[in-house]
Amino acid sequence: MIGAGGYADNRWGAAASTGTGEVAIRTSTARSVILYMKMGLALPEALQEALRDLRDLRDPYAEYIALIGLDREGRHAGYTHRPNERYAYMTDAMTEPEEVKSIHISH
């Protein structure tokens, strides 16, 4: 479903979620990240706010969602309710992807 698991708008950036898709659909999680950036939040804050939206559902499966995002300048970030989550990224200047630890936010 567009806007829940993945969303992109070249004016602001892109976001994707992994985990329990039914929960991401309820809040259009990926689209929410982009909307928060449109409203003036930087990527890290937009990802955090989208995770707060999920937390406010009080759904036990919301803790399984992980978010990654990219702003229009190419800066990336990953946020999750679960400790020790990682994501990988690669730019056109790289020959191999790099794995990065996501930032953990308590659920």
Name each model feature, range by range.
Residues 1-107:
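N-terminal nucleophile
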